[in-house]
Amino acid sequence: MAEKKTRTRKTKNTEVTEAKLEKIETEASPEVQANKEEPKKEENKPHQVQVNVDFLRKTKVHIAMPCYGGMLTEATFTSFIKWANTAKQLGIDWTLETMVNESLISRGRNTLVAKFLGASEDTTHLMFIDADIGWEPWHLLVLLNRDVDVIGGLYPMKSLPVKWVVNGIKDGEEGPDGLQEVSKAGTGFLLIKRHVFDKLNDHPAVKPYKNDIGLDVKFDQFLKTYFDTAVRENRYLSEDWTFCANWRDLGGKIFIDRRVLLRHSGSYVFSHENQEHLLKTIGPMYLNQQVKENKVKILDEAGNSIPTT
């Protein structure tokens, strides 16, 4: 009697016998697949972030936004609408100053600082937000709540793969819930306490300059090179990197909150030549497709939920 031949199939790394083949084919059948229970998906529970609302109400943040050509992105516009609603609900005082048609960004930032310092003495913080940054109300709330001199959020450069606009520091100070000391942070989303500028006046690189842009004379005494380009260690530094370097020269520290992940709007040239690559990497997209945010629930000091929309 002839022996029964064993059905086999060679694969790249092993040999599959008939018994294994039958098991694989059975498990792959539509009937078996239909009766399989789908694994339970974990609920997308919101991450909880707690802030001290009483403390926030004692602050007055002045938001400064350079808007070259008087333009801002849709992401930035909708962010401000949500922030205005949240600040009103919580009773947080804030003001806004924009800068249009200033092609020299360093001078534009210095002008915004002068207006911040000269407009009102009761403003406690200057918050730089660029016109191409998308953010959520809780992002600004948690930065204020940190109560440190200089702190920013993380936003990517306008390129792929993602690289953050920040420079780390070896053995930098770390705090709870994502607080991280860095050497430099971008001014696209940067919060600065008022007294920082008073202390920077002691730095030799910070110099007064003539008001030749038609600014109100009451701001003349505040026009100084807080933001300027510089060459250090054979590297050309942008105005925000120079600001950070000068502050650290005086013993100051700079932090980022790793929870504050922002959106950085840019332009992209679409063509048939890169269509296949885009579809593989990011899928079908529309120019203004809404970015899905991780759910975050903001709590006050008593543990009550704070509306942020």
Where are these regions (language model features)?
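Conserved donor sugar-nucleotide recognition element shared by glycan-biosynthetic enzymes
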Residues: 105-109, 240
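Active-site nucleotide-sugar/metal-binding loop of Leloir-type enzymes
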Residues: 111-125
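Conserved catalytic core of nucleotide-sugar-dependent glycosyltransferases
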Residues: 136-228
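Arg/Lys-rich low-complexity patches in intrinsically disordered regions that function as generic
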Residues: 2-13, 37
